[in-house]
């Protein structure tokens, strides 16, 4: 049985390379991102990690297709550079919403299924 993996933020950078590497290893990789279209590295499902309903629907779609989820790679995120005194507070809140709460939303949607399965790491 091939492992079923979700990679968030899988259409660019580290997420894209992670999806490609896992696909090469024989995994069925689903990537969640805000983009309308995905890449050749994984099965694309449009889902913004800042939207709990989109995340829940995306997880349900993977489960409907595969019946299980083996691994979740929480990769969605972005950085802000520069001195803190020049950092826009709203942009910092958005970063925290994507980078931290996005991971929380994905894990809350996936972990109950993994617990029922009796296995499945979240990275």
Where are these regions (language model features)?
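Conserved glycine-rich cofactor-binding loop
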Residues: 11-12
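Conserved glycine-rich Rossmann-like NAD(P)H-binding loop of the short-chain dehydrogenase/reductase
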Residues: 20, 25-40
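A hydrophobic alpha-helix adjacent to the NAD(P)-binding/active-site core of NAD(P)-dependent oxidoreductases
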Residues: 44, 87, 95-96
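The beta1-alpha1 cofactor-binding region of Rossmann-like NAD(H)/NADP(H)-dependent oxidoreductases
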Residues: 47-57, 89
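A glycine-rich helix->loop->beta "capping" turn
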Residues: 61-74, 80
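Hydrophobic positions on the long internal alpha-helix
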Residues: 73, 106-110
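Substrate-binding pocket helix/loop in short-chain dehydrogenase/reductase
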Residues: 83-84, 91-93
């Amino acid at each position: 049985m091939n492992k079923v993996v979700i990679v968030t933020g899988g259409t660019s950078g580290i997420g894209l390379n992670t999806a490609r590497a896992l696909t090469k290893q024989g995994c069925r990789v689903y990537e969640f991102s805000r983009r309308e279209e995905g890449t050749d590295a994984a099965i694309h499902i449009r889902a913004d990690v800042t939207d709990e309903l989109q995340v829940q629907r995306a997880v349900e779609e993977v489960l409907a297709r595969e019946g299980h989820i083996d691994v979740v790679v929480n990769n969605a995120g972005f950085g802000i550079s520069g001195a803190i005194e020049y950092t826009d507070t709203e942009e910092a809140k958005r970063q925290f919403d994507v980078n931290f709460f996005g991971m929380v939303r994905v894990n809350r949607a996936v972990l109950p299924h993994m617990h029922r399965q009796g296995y499945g790491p979240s990275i």
